[in-house]
Amino acid sequence: LAAFAAIGLALLYRAAEGVRHAPADQPAAVGVVPRESVARLENSIAVLPFTNISNEPDNEYFCEGISEEILNALSGFRQLNVIGRTSSFAFKGSDVGIAQISAQLGVGHVLQGSVRKVGKQLRISAQLLDEAGRQVWTETFDRELANIFEIQSEIAAAVAAKVASQVTSSA
């Protein structure tokens, strides 16, 4: 029994030697395996949390909500490989570039956006970028703030349909 335990520990140690770690002066993003790059999935996309660029910090929940709604809507397209919320939202507020995010997550496309709110007016901008950070598609949606969930669902469906078409046609 001791021999099996020793062999198991030796194998575990050898496997751990191959694991790459982020440098000590650069903490790894939470929920993301720190690595240089992974093989890119075909028809793949990560949805980053949309940025709140209004003067109201309380709008963060709406930004995360619209991002999550879009992610969920994209997941409904079978031909897409959509990176999960935990992995993509780990880059919230980071200064990591799109090319590096794409390489770390193994995706060919990244969707990012912003939300502005002034009074009852809402502007949501979405941008689809390729793995090099080049803009592939963009659209802006202006709405009057009434039913927040209805707005999120409506815009998420529109963005997901357009993004899915762009991602699958570029493969």
Residue ranges and their predicted role:
Residues 2-171:
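Acidic, proline/glycine-rich low-complexity intrinsically disordered segments
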